[in-house]
Each structure stands twice: as structure tokens, then as C-alpha cells.
Amino acid sequence: LHSLKKRFAGKIKSIIIDPPYYFKKTKSSDAFNYNSNFKLSTWLVFMKNRLDVAKEMLSDEGLCIIIIGEEGYAQLKLLADNILGGDKYIGTISWRKSDNQANIGEFAKVTDYILIYKKSSGKLNKLPLTDKARKEYRYSDENGYFRRQILLDKTRGKYNYELTTPTGKKLYGPWMKEKEEIERLDNLGKIYWTRGGQEQPYGKLYLQDSEGQIPNDFWDNSFGTNQRGAEEIRELFSGDRLFDFPKPERLIYNLIKISSEEGDLVLDFFMGSGTTVAVAHKMNRQYIGIEQMDYIETVAVERLKKVIDGEQGGISQDVAWSGGGSFIYAELM
């Protein structure tokens, strides 16, 4: 990471990392293929040293995204606030990481947390509309499908004036838009009038004009689960369970979607099974992946080769991936 700092300082649009988690209780086995038995102070120093460099590498529009478990979340949030800036904190996504839950112990933990920070002027992109959101566009006219936009709102409206309906009924607000704007939209055919006793105007928000929907702070298992991530690895490597908790391509796809555009540079310095770089490749992003463990050659590098050959797992069909491209693999001696 330090060897790349000078060349790529201020050039990274999206940093997405899934670092070793902190655990309060010692693990008998290395659940994450990293040292999972840090003392809290050691783990925080470990993270601080890397976040310091990460901040330097972000562009002014860049975003830093960190995936972490519940046990280390509070401490990492304080550390990241200190390094990246509490005023640069955008929010935390709670991600349902499991298809099911264990019914043993006292409390089932089925979510991980995704912290999002901006360097300076960075902002999140919108996500594609879900099937549920698309169903809201159930009205149609000659211009296409649309959903209704509330204009008469007695709670939030701030404009008071008289408006006459097509049948001559008088409405008095309060309105969400100024009278001149509603009249302009009506003249353009962009007002939907209900009929009957509840006659009132609504704006028309067309499906084809939608740029998507803003991200929210809870992502359910439609964004993928750890089980799905493990299945993707097994499908790539002849059924071998190489990682216990790899992130699914669907989750990383959405994180890359909200934090970058095509051609932008994505960095993951805890590359692990290579999910982030594989998804970045399929999404036409530039990327840098860093991994200190020996399995980089047998897992991440081999996975990228399969991506170039056109493998059809993960998000491939959703993005019409058919293969191609290249990458450079180098070892720091």
C-alpha cells in the first residue's frame, strides 16, 4: 500500500475494504484467513496505519467504504471519524449477511455494517430501481409509465393559494409547488387529475426520467449473503470451500455502483478472494487489489483469469459480461 501511495495519491475514486474483523473472544481457527485474534489496541493500530494511507490516495470526489462486524463497529467508527473526518461521514448500511439465523445462544447476529466516508466533495450515486419500486410506475399516458407525485399536502405543503380543477372545483392547498409551476406542468400535460369526490392534481414522474433510487441504510439479503458468496467461490473452484465468509458479488456490485462510474479507479487493499476486483472488472472500472497472503496466486489471480475468460457466475448475466480485458499481477519483493 505504501509503495503505491506516491503514484496514486489523490487518484482513487472508490476504496472498498473488507478488513480482518475484530473479535472479543479468541477464535480457535482462522475464520477469515487472516489473523483473527488481534487485541483491540493492536487491531486499531493495524487499521489506523492503513486508513491514514487510504485517505491520501482518495481523490477529492472519492469515497471510502469499510465492511465490518458488530464487535468492532463502534471502535472503528470512532477511529475512522478521527482519520477521515466525522464531518465526512455519510452513513452506515446495515447489511443482512445471512439467509437464515442460528437459534442457539442468547442473541443472533445476522447483520454486518458498512461505513461510508467521503474525502471532500464525494457523493453517492443512485441505485437501479428495484422491481418493487418499478411497480409504483403503474399509470401511463402517451409519454410512458409514471407514478404520481403528491402536490396537495396539508402537512408538508408551504404554498397557499386557490386552484380550480377541470370540473370547476376549488382547492386551497397547502401545496408543495408554487401555483405558476403547477399551471406550467398542467399545460404540458404533466399533471394527473383524479376524478370523483377526491378530485385533485398529482405530478407525473416518468419511469424513463428516473435516475434510480438513493441508497438507504438497510440492505436485505436481496443484496447477496455470505452463503451466496461462498457458493460463488465453490462454483469457480470445483466445489472447494476456500473462504468461510466471502462477500457476494451482488453486494460489491452495489457498493461499486454507488461510489464510482465506468473508468474510475477502485482500490481494495484486503483483496482476499478477489470479489471486489472481479466485480470491478465486469463493471468496466480500473482497479488495484492488494493481498499479503500466499493464496493470491491460487484464488484472486485465478479468479480474474476466469473473469477474462467470460465466467458467468455472480453478476455476469446482470451486466451482460462476456469476457475480455486484462490485468497486471506483480509481487513486492
Predicted regions: what they are:
Residues 1-3, 305-333:
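S-adenosyl-L-methionine
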Residues 84-87, 282, 324:
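Short, well-ordered coil/turn elements that cap or connect secondary structure elements
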